[in-house]
Regions:
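Glycine-rich phosphate-binding loops of nucleotide-dependent enzymes
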Residues: 1-132
């Protein structure tokens, strides 16, 4: 419908999506733009929480920057974001709290002054505060 096309056009513009046609399949887009399509579909539902699994895996550096800006905008608007990532830079740059899991259990919780690269690496390797 015309309303659906207008909504899609606005969402594509809001997300700075690069595409040849709104009718093009998402599989024809770059990794970063394909991720934006997925996020855009969820944002149409006005979620209070987004769950993301390695959201920038396989995405080029430029698209990662745009994606990070989008996530920051969403959190500034009140959307909570919970995501899994194996990218330390991503965790340190975007998160205000990181849970390090091992075998399904929380090994460590890092936030505030404890959320540093050295603590993140140590927790990932299984080192306790006393051993650091």
């Amino acid at each position: 419908t015309n309303t659906a096309r207008q909504t899609a056009t606005k969402a594509a513009s809001d997300l700075s999506l690069v595409y040849s046609s709104l009718d093009a399949p998402a599989s024809s887009l770059s990794g970063g733009n394909a991720q934006k399509v997925v996020i855009g579909k969820w944002l149409l539902r006005d979620p209070k929480l987004l769950l993301l699994n390695d959201p920038t895996k396989g995405v080029d550096v430029g698209a990662k920057g745009e994606f990070y800006a989008l996530l920051r905008d969403l959190t500034a608007q009140g959307t909570a974001i919970l995501f899994y990532s194996s990218d330390d830079d991503e965790l340190l740059g975007l998160c205000n709290r990181v849970l390090v899991l091992q075998d399904g259990h929380v090994r460590d919780e890092l936030s505030g002054e404890r959320l540093t690269r050295s603590n993140l690496v140590a927790a990932s390797m299984g080192t306790t505060d006393e051993q650091r």
